[in-house]
């Protein structure tokens, strides 16, 4: 489920970007991206995906280098923390509670969801040796820190310059606001290559799950390799239809994050705690998902099922009503502990 949402969000992201730059209809970009990815991934499999990862990394470095150069040498005084602090001082305040809860929220979400990303585990087991794997992870760790910092900085600048900026396109808003043709063309090429490479990883990941789990779960021994291709095509059609609607990418990810948060402790602790059986694991995940959904915010982040819908918001502490997403993810992650306690009592 998470990887299907991820697939939809990836296609939606590049479709929105193309629409933002050139006005291209969402469905046209979605069709091109999905068709291209399926065309070589269903044939080349994991080898093709790993090969395109090299292209993806190169494209990412070029894109970030162009962005960094553009910001540094643009001459604008807006690209500084002083500007952000002047316009929106709360964004840089360590005493502003939403800053802390937002950071914790996305830490929980990213940690939980990536543990369920089969594409990551495929890369782990495809490594030639443990030594190479450790070296790769360490280098990736060093690379990703400045990238996340830079992307976060551009987001702060974008929202400070324009309160109406689309959050999903904040980074590209910075690069495209001057409407420089060569930069627009470069972004289109690099963004498409990045998206296609990410999508092929997801397609391979979903396909491998169908093959492995199909053989282990179902008693009938069918050709799950063949079945996986059919299922991938069906999921791609769903991704095409949904991405053509242009729904919020962030909200799609958050829905998938919620499910992963509700399952992460149960799934991984069950590897070590023999007391967590199948029925107890299912109950734990359901409890986590229930509590998470009760606090999961609406698309405008103003209310949730419990706060603002079933019960008025003013009877709850202000902390809860202002931190619905954090409360949702926190409860979804740790509420399954209740099921473990109940199981011990029984």
Role assignments for model-derived ranges:
Residues 1-346:
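Membrane-embedded helix-loop-helix hairpins and adjacent transmembrane boundary segments
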């Amino acid at each position: 489920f998470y990887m299907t949402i991820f697939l939809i969000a990836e296609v939606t992201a590049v479709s929105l970007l193309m629409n933002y730059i050139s006005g291209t209809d969402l469905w046209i970009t979605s069709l091109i991206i999905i068709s291209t990815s399926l065309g070589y991934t269903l044939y080349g499999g994991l080898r093709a995906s790993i090969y395109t990862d090299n292209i993806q990394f190169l494209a990412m470095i070029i894109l970030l280098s162009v962005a960094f150069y553009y910001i540094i040498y643009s001459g604008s005084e807006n690209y500084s923390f002083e500007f952000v602090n002047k316009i929106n001082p709360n964004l840089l305040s360590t005493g502003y509670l939403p800053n802390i809860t937002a950071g914790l929220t996305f830490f929980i979400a990213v940690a939980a969801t990536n543990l369920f990303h089969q594409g990551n585990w495929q890369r782990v087991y495809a490594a030639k040796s443990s030594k190479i794997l450790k070296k790769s992870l360490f280098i990736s760790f060093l690379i990703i820190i400045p990238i996340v910092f830079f992307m976060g900085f551009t987001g702060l600048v974008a929202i400070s310059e324009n309160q109406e900026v689309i959050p999903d396109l904040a980074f590209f808003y910075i690069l495209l606001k001057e409407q420089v043709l060569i930069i627009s063309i470069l972004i289109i090429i690099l963004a498409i290559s990045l998206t296609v490479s990410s999508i092929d990883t997801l397609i391979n990941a979903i396909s491998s799950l169908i093959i492995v789990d199909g053989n282990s779960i179902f008693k009938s021994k069918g050709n799950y390799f063949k079945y996986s291709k059919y299922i991938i095509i069906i999921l791609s059609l769903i991704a095409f239809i949904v991405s053509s609607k242009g729904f919020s990418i962030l909200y799609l990810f958050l829905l998938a994050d919620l499910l992963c948060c509700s399952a992460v402790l149960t799934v991984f602790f069950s590897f070590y705690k023999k007391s967590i059986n199948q029925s107890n694991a299912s109950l734990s995940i359901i409890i986590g998902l229930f509590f998470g959904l009760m606090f999961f915010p609406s698309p405008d982040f103003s209310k949730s099922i419990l706060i603002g819908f079933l019960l008025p918001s003013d009877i709850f502490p202000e902390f809860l009503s202002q931190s619905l997403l954090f409360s949702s993810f926190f409860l979804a992650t740790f509420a399954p502990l209740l099921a473990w306690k109940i199981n011990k009592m029984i």
